[in-house]
């Protein structure tokens, strides 16, 4: 008998970028629920179109339209979140017609309710005023590494969820002391591959914000050990801040935490599938999921 209590809700990456993967995976998830853990579910899928001025965090490439992705998430009763986490927005950017049309669409098609992940205070207040039906998530791009800063953010009523920096994932003594109303708002970033000692995380995110706005500025080059190898799930698993399936079931759920974010925008869809297998799929059914999605007798890898 597992010691979990409650349901773990996963927030998955690539709303636009990995549309084709989710279009195959979600029907399987519905038709064969026995393949997947009964104590977890998909809470949302997050992302932004390629040309979204307000976007941040990572650059996402896709030719899928907002109406297409919303049709998919609505069909499966999953919340869609826009990653509007650009940290460098100025007042003149708030009038962008494409971003406003995007928010209107996500607000109108709100069954289930859709949300937005935000960084800039300017945009937070703008969305709260103009698109009040979108729930707001405080972005991990704020790099909240100080627990007092996290507590202040959790106390803000405008945010339904707050994603702290992954280096607070194991601050168990202070996390356990939070009231349940604030525990319900903490959304842990589970599979970060970034170096635990990184001091350039904010600069990394700002470089993406500049690109989306078309602003000049230095390119960010990651100086972390092993950066040249790119993202590796095995390295993420060795990260002191990593939260795997056992930790969720045995440590976080029993302590009253239920929200878990999986990163992955900008990666390949094969890696995203590995995340779906690790976090959602019972080990004895992982091969069956692979066979349903891509693995057949004609597939050559080499």
Label every model-predicted segment.
Residues 1-149, 153, 159-302:
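Active-site pocket-lining/capping segments in soluble small-molecule metabolic enzymes
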